Amino acid sequence: MLLAIVVISAAVPSFGQSSPYPNERDVPKGWVTAPSSKANPSLWECAGYGGSQIVSLEEGSLRIGKPPDEEPEQVPLPQQLKLSKEMHGSRSLLRTADGWLVGFDAGEFGGGLWWFNNEGDENQKLLSENVHAIYHTRDGVFALVGLAHLSLNSGQIYQFTETAEEVRVTHLADLGGSPEASTVDSDGRFVVATPRSVVAVDYAGNLRELYRPGEDLTYPTSVVVDANGDIFAGMRFFVLRLVPGNSGDYRPQWLMEKECQSFKIVKRICTCGDKY
């Protein structure tokens, strides 16, 4: 399975726990359970000015880090692929049987999905939507597209197919929001964080909402699923953890850095601990 990709002071109470849930997990070292926005609105205001958290897996273990200071380099394209003016923004790239699939995401300025032949002298526009990710899974090739900007918040999954006669995409699922971060779990499901929810979609297009919070997700950056089946979504200031239960539902646990139990907004930056 290949991924082609190419974001005041207070005391802090905790969420209540739902039950029953097997195998209660420890909170990652240096992190604590965060309060709801209702319990501590000042913290959530500060979080809107906080730095982003990036989640990843290293040898199956969760790692939480900060994004690099420099902008990530663009995905390099084969030299023979010639881009038009409308092909701009961050890129996703996947080699196909007879060519290349290239996606673009320029936010509110547009995007799209194109197929190029091997020689690069022919291309076909397949979608006019912003492409967030292209996946090659055991069930085929899929593109996650969408946009969250001002009042807009939409997202879709399309399946790409390629034959000797044609290349095309077919609609698989409506995500209900822009796929800001995503991954594929061990069952082959897409696990997607939108600005307002976390959903899972199987290869047949069946969507299941895993979490729709009282809290909007604060600009999701990344999603991973660990060996226990716990889902982690990194975002601005927080990490959301979803712990699977016996009945197939998920218990949400909002996490934040321990030092952020004291915080202050300084020059429109959320500053934690003794840094202010």
Ranges and model annotations:
Residues 32-52, 82-95, 127-138, 175-184, ...:
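Repeated scaffold domains used in trafficking and secretory/extracellular systems
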Residues 14-18:
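Boundary at the C-terminal end of the N-terminal hydrophobic targeting segment
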Residues 73-85, 120-126, 166-173, 207-213, ...:
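A short beta-strand motif characteristic of beta-propeller blades
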Residues 116-120, 161-165, 202-206, 243-247:
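Short loop/turn segments that connect beta-strands within beta-propeller blades
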Residues 53-56, 63, 100-102, 141-143, ...:
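Conserved beta-propeller blade signature
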Residues 63, 108-114, 150-158, 197-202, ...:
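Structural motif
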Residues 1-11:
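Bacterial N-terminal signal peptides
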Residues 50, 57-59, 96, 109, ...:
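Short loop/turn segments that connect beta-strands within the blades of beta-propeller domains
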